[in-house]
Every structure is written in structure tokens, then in C-alpha cells.
């Protein structure tokens, strides 16, 4: 089955990125947009763009699904963020007879929070960061764990991601005073529905954040497109990513590939995704999580492999076999440009974009969703 009409349930640069590949394949892109994005470049680029109802937005699953039905979309590409990891939305898309461009909801559910992902890793023989897989609400449990593994330790919301929901504790006094434990004494609503808890892990300092860009088809064929290093972060948000991850010993790289394969096979993962790990120079390697979607930093893997990962996503969603991938060549570095105010400790800021001058030349790639005159709002 050829997917020719793709609704992109997202905005800005990732919507433009997906739309480019859809066009390259000869298909049509359909884009929902909010009032704030009426004049956005992504809205202009899409073959068809439709305003979402007043008061709804990019997380309004029902509005987006109704738009997909009314426009004859064959598939929905969620991009990243918003509804990309919403299991109930993925189920609703499939139940409506529309192709979900991503792993099956069952795989998403198994990997969708940090607690269940740890359980998957353990069952697959992949070592997670030392921690407690059960829900943690008591200070005594944290202190007992720290007595065994040492401080610092990290409390993590099971639905956290993108640097959200992490509380690092460095001593018993901080454990006694942190509000993070009080928050989970009663049922806490999750960011994508349901309720969440938090787990406890050893916070490993001076570790590198390395990951594998993976793909697996419905026939069991698996490949790592490239490794990546995403160690340089601020406030647990990635700022600079490099592919392949430099200075990895051959045995560690082989272990990354094998661990990633085990994780994908454990949940019968079909699609494109990323396995994230911590690595220390002493040889420690621990599993963090699987991101069941495209990531911002997918571009560096594409550049060193000559692979279009969005095209791979669409092929796998069509039921095709994973194509033969080229060996990695060279290195690619991505730098995220953020809208922050240096006079306010680099706090996120808003305003009108008065000028943009992008770099150009051989080997330079720019992924953007902005133009001069655009307003950076607090809404996204």
C-alpha cells in the first residue's frame, strides 16, 4: 500500500521536514494549524492546510483525527512532541482505519514510561541505570537506596521526557525537604492521560549520553543507522549532538547495537526509534529509555548515513522491508538555536523575529520553521 496523503500532526520545523519527504515521494501533505500559525512557513509549505477549531490545538486528538477523516488522509505522522507518544491517540488513529506512522501502540505502551521501560530492559538482558523500578513515595526508601549506591540520586517522573520531571538529590537533608516526594502521595495525572508515579535511580555524574538511531521492519530486520553523542546539555535539554558518537571503543559500540536490538525485539518494535544510554570512560553502559518517534537530532544520523529517516518511517508503515543502509561516513554536528534571554539566566523568551541570516555552503544543513516577522509566542 502506498501512502500518498499524509496528515502531519505537528508544526514548525518538524512539520516542514516531514512535508519535504512526502513531496519527494510524490505525495500530498495535510497540515492542521492554530491561529498563531496562520502565516507560519510550515502552513505555507503544506499542500493542504486547515485551521483547527477555535480553542483547540496540536494536542487535541479528537480534532486532529476528525480532520484526518474529513480530508481523506491515509496516514498520520505525529512528528515529535504533542501527540507523538500518546498511546490512546495512536490506538484511535488505527481504529479509524488510518495508518499510524510509528511503532504499534503496544510497543509504545511498553516503552512509554520509565518504569515499564526499565522492566522491558531487565527482561531483555539490558542493564538499566541502577535504580528502583517500583513507585517511590517515601523518603526512607530514597535514603536506603542512597546508602547502598551513594549520592547523588535522581527521582524521575515516569512520564518525563525532554528534561522534564527530574529531581536530583545530593544528601539526606535534600531528601527530607524535596517537594517531589509529596507530589506523588496521591494519584497524579500524566501529561498524556492516566496517572504517573516516579522511580528512583542513581544519578551518574561525568557520564556521556550516547544513543542509537534504530530501525526495524515487520520481518524482523534491524539496523542501527548511526550512534550519536548528546552529552552537551543545559537544564537536561540537548544543545549539541554529534553522529557518530566519537571515541567509542569497538566493544562498546557493538554492545550498543546488540542492546538496542534486544530492546526492539522485546516489544516487537516496528518503525524508527532511538535507544538512549549512559556511558562512562570506565566502561559502564546503562540503558536510559527508548524514544518511539523521530527526534530533533535525527538530522545528524541522516547526514552521515545518506538515509532519509522520514522516508524509512513511511516505508515501514507501508509494510516494506528495511532497505540496505550505507556505512556511516564522516561526522555531523547539530547545534540547536534557542530563544533565550542571557540577561535572565537564559530563561526562555518571546518576541518578534526581526532578522534571520542562516549559514550556507557545502555540508551545511538548516532545519527551521521561522521567518522574519514571525512572533515567538509562549504557546509552543
Label for each model-derived stretch:
Residues 1-124, 136-144:
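ATP-binding N-terminal substructure of ATP-dependent carboxylate-amine bond-forming enzymes
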Residues 2-29, 46-50, 69-71, 94, ...:
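ATP-dependent carboxylate activation and anion-phosphoryl transfer catalytic cores
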Residues 96, 148-150, 174:
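Short alpha-helix boundary/capping motifs
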Residues 114-116, 159-165, 330:
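Conserved A3 ("GATE") glycine/threonine-rich loop of ANL adenylate-forming enzymes
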Residues 131-132:
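Conserved beta3 strand of the protein kinase N-lobe
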Residues 144-155:
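Acidic/histidine-enriched active-site and ligand-binding environments that engage anionic O-linkages
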Residues 169:
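Conserved, charged catalytic cores of large soluble enzymes
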Amino acid at each position: 500500500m502506498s501512502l500518498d496523503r499524509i496528515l502531519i500532526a505537528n508544526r514548525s520545523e518538524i512539520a516542514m521536514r516531514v512535508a519535504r519527504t512526502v513531496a519527494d515521494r510524490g505525495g500530498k501533505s495535510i497540515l492542521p494549524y492554530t491561529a498563531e500559525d496562520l502565516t507560519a512557513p510550515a502552513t505555507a509549505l503544506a499542500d493542504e492546510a486547515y485551521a483547527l477549531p477555535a480553542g483547540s490545538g496540536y494536542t487535541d486528538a479528537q480534532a486532529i483525527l476528525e480532520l484526518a477523516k474529513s480530508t481523506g488522509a491515509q496516514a498520520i505522522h505525529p512528528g515529535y512532541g504533542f501527540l507523538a507518544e500518546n498511546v490512546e491517540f495512536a490506538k484511535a488513529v488505527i481504529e479509524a482505519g488510518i495508518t499510524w506512522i510509528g511503532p504499534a501502540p503496544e510497543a509504545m505502551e511498553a516503552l512509554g514510561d520509565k518504569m515499564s521501560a526499565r522492566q522491558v530492559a531487565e527482561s531483555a538482558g539490558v542493564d538499566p541505570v541502577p535504580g528502583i523500578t517500583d513507585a517511590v513515595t517515601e523518603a526512607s526508601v530514597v535514603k536506603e537506596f542512597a546508602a547502598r549506591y551513594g549520592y547523588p540520586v535522581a527521582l524521575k517522573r515516569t512520564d518525563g521526557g525532554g528534561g522534564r520531571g527530574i529531581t536530583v538529590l545530593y544528601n539526606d537533608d535534600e531528601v527530607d525537604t524535596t517537594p517531589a516526594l509529596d507530589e506523588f502521595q496521591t494519584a497524579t495525572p500524566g501529561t498524556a492521560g492516566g496517572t504517573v508515579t516516579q522511580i528512583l535511580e542513581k544519578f551518574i555524574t561525568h557520564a556521556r549520553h550516547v544513543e542509537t538511531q534504530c530501525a526495524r521492519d515487520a520481518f524482523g530486520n534491524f539496523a542501527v543507522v548511526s550512534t550519536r553523542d548528546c552529552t552537551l546539555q543545559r537544564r537536561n535539554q540537548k544543545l549539541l549532538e554529534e553522529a557518530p558518537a566519537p571515541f567509542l571503543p569497538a566493544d562498546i559500540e557493538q554492545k550498543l547495537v546488540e542492546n538496542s536490538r534486544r530492546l526492539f525485539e522485546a516489544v516487537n518494535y516496528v518503525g524508527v526509534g532511538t535507544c538512549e544510554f549512559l556511558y562512562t570512560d570506565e566502561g559502564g553502559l546503562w540503558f536510559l529509555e527508548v524514544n518511539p518517534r523521530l527526534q530533533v537530532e535525527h538530522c545528524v544520523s541522516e547526514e552521515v548515513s545518506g538515509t532519509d529517516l522520514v522516508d524509512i518511517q513511511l516505508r515501514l508503515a507501508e509494510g516494506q522491508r528495511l532497505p540496505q543502509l550505507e556505512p556511516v561516513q564522516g561526522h555531523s554536528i547539530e547545534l540547536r538555536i534557542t530563544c533565550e534571554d542571557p540577561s535572565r539566566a537564559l530563561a526562555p523568551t518571546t518576541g518578534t523575529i526581526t532578522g534571520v541570516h542562516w549559514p550556507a555552503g557545502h555540508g551545511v544543513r538548516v532545519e527551521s520553521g521561522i521567518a522574519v516577522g514571525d512572533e515567538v509566542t509562549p504557546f509552543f
